């Protein structure tokens, strides 16, 4: 897996395509400023950019580790503590949005807000803090936006690309060619949900790691054959989780660049 991003590029993956439609659907003037906010299960991201002749010039970006998914209880209700963390973050984001009109702003929620039984209650509070409406997007739409964001961030290649995004509550896998996603899937598993299910106290053992691997294999099995049949020439990772893994395997000398199967095997061994 390659992670072809500069220092903050992974933060753009779900934001650039949120900005792109504004130049067409919302009739923004070429030099206007637009903003997008992604309320992820693990972290919240905001990007502010100037749209100029279809090109995006990033002016500001903010990222906070809110860990909204950790606040889901056994009944899939968000705790008051997790809601307050999110609202505090959005209050800070809101300060940056004061001079951006609603027509030039898109705010989306993802997996945790799709799952939470009290999502509507939280969204009402969040919209009051921001002064703007929030759209909870579907898994396939999230996957589509991730793919388009990646394609705006990497060099074009001939053939098909597999994009993998491991979020806090969901994982998206998209095969596409150039800017056309050909097949996309959003699976209900992520770094936070797997951690809660298998490593809730932070301890890693062979049995717990095996349990996590089985969960992931079971979720991937229904789509495996179809994805292998479609094929791809390169795999690109598009999340903070993947970037963190790459940083570890490169630092330890297990890979010169990117993430290889052998590097992952050595990382697994080092964790035990």
Predicted features along the sequence, with ranges:
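Helical "lid/coupling" subdomains associated with nucleotide-phosphate turnover
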Residues: 32-34, 48-53, 66-67, 71-102, ...
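Conserved ATP-binding subdomain of kinase catalytic cores across diverse folds
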Residues: 58-67
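Short, low-complexity, charge-dense intrinsically disordered segments
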Residues: 3-25
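Generic start-of-chain signal for non-secretory N-termini
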Residues: 26-31
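A generic, well-ordered mixed alpha/beta core segment in the N-terminal half of proteins
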Residues: 162-170, 174
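Conserved Rossmann-like nucleotide-cofactor binding loop
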Residues: 42-44, 169
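Aromatic- and glycine-enriched glycan-recognition loops and surfaces
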Residues: 37
């Amino acid at each position: 897996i390659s992670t072809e991003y500069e220092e903050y590029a992974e933060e753009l993956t779900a934001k650039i395509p949120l900005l792109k439609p504004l130049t067409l659907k919302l009739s923004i003037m070429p030099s206007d400023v637009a903003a997008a906010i992604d309320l992820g299960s693990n972290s919240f991201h905001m990007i502010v950019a100037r749209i100029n002749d279809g090109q995006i010039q990033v002016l500001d970006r903010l990222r906070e580790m809110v860990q909204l998914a950790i606040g889901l209880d056994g009944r899939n209700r968000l705790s008051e503590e997790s809601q307050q963390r999110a609202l505090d973050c959005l209050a800070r984001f809101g300060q940056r949005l004061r001079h951006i009109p609603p027509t030039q702003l898109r705010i989306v929620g993802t997996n945790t807000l799709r799952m939470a039984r009290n999502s509507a209650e939280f969204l009402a509070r969040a919209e009051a803090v921001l002064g703007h409406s929030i759209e909870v997007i579907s898994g396939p739409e999230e996957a589509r936006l991730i793919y388009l964001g990646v394609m705006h961030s990497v060099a074009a290649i001939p053939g098909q690309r597999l994009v993998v995004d491991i979020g806090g509550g969901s994982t998206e896998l998209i095969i596409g060619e150039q800017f056309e996603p050909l097949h996309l899937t959003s699976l209900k598993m992520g770094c936070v949900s797997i951690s809660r299910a298998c490593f809730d106290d932070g301890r890693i053992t062979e049995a717990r790691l095996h349990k996590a691997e089985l969960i992931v294999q079971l979720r991937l099995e229904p789509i495996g054959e179809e994805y292998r049949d479609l094929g791809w020439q390169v795999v690109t990772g598009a999340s903070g989780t993947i970037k963190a893994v790459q940083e570890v395997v490169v630092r330890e000398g297990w890979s010169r660049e990117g993430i290889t199967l052998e590097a992952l095997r050595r990382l697994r061994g080092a964790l035990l």
